[in-house]
């Protein structure tokens, strides 16, 4: 484990150096210069208001993991803590393309919004939504019908594979609806509506997932209740975020 930790730190350091060299080199369109590295308060406020969304998402994910591991250790023991680790690894791999689609759409949406091209922004939202939904639906199908194949990638232990297969189907039951959350939050961040993005990030993780993670096992669902909290939050939080986006930002741009 020590070797893995050291390797992670080394990879992060190398990645940081590589990015800094590129951004300060001749190939960068806007190269970094030390003499121009100044802090402008009016820009800092906007940067922080949007950047805090990502921070909150990471922080709430950690909070959820703490709650999940605590409840699983009580109701299921080390086996189910390991199962959650396997499922989280699968989830991280599956969410990367969806995040890539929505994150990649942000500059396009922001540019056209700033240029006043509202119909292009609306078209971009539709395309992004369709692409993300098609992908998450295909990923959901794969997780439902080939869970054993996915679990074997991350563990050779048969007992853990069997437990992971059962819980993976529960955990991924609402994965398709996660695309609604990604798309809605991406639109809010692209338009600079940070308050909406923060609100729905907190809604899904802090208001829905954490309480359900603590409550469902206590009402007789045991370890299944811990994994069931995720699909419930995906459905409720995802639909709430996307419908709000359609009724506010998307509708407003249709009038302009």
Tell me the role of every PLM-derived stretch.
Residues 1-51, 109-174, 216-256:
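Short alpha-helical transmembrane segments in multi-pass integral membrane proteins
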Residues 3, 61-65, 77, 99-103, ...:
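Functionally critical, cavity-lining and gating residues within the transmembrane helices
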Residues 8-15, 19, 23, 41-104, ...:
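Transmembrane helical elements of multi-pass membrane transporters/channels
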Residues 9, 54-62, 74, 92, ...:
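Residue-level hotspots within the lipid-embedded alpha helices of multi-pass solute transporters
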Residues 38, 78, 87, 99, ...:
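Short, well-ordered coil↔helix boundary/capping segments
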Residues 69, 81-141, 145-147, 178-200:
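Small-residue-rich hydrophobic transmembrane alpha-helices
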Residues 72, 76, 113-114, 155, ...:
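Short helix-loop-helix connector
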Residues 209-217:
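Hydrophobic alpha-helical transmembrane segments in multi-pass integral membrane proteins
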């Amino acid at each position: 484990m020590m070797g893995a930790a050291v390797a992670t730190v080394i990879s992060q350091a190398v990645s940081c150096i590589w990015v800094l060299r590129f951004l300060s080199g001749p190939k960068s369109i806007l190269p970094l210069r030390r003499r121009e590295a100044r802090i402008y308060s009016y820009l800092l406020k906007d940067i922080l208001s949007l950047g805090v969304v990502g921070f909150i998402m990471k922080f709430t994910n950690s909070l959820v993991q703490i709650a999940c591991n605590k409840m699983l250790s009580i109701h299921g023991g080390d086996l189910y803590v390991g199962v959650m680790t396997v499922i989280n690894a699968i989830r991280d791999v599956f969410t990367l393309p969806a995040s890539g689609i929505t994150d990649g759409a942000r500059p396009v949406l922001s540019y056209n919004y700033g240029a006043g091209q509202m119909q292009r922004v609306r078209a971009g939202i539709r395309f992004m939504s369709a692409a993300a939904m098609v992908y998450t639906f295909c990923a959901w199908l794969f997780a439902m019908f080939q869970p054993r194949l996915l679990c074997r990638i991350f563990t050779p232990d048969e007992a853990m594979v069997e437990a992971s297969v059962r819980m993976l189907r529960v955990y991924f039951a609402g994965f398709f609806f996660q695309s609604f959350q990604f798309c809605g939050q991406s639109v809010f961040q692209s338009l600079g509506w940070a308050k909406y993005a923060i609100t729905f990030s907190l809604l899904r993780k802090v208001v829905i997932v954490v309480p359900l993670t603590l409550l469902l096992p206590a009402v007789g669902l045991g370890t299944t209740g811990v994994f069931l909290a995720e699909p419930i939050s995906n459905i409720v939080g995802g639909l709430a975020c996307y419908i709000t986006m359609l009724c506010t930002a998307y509708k407003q741009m249709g009038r302009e």
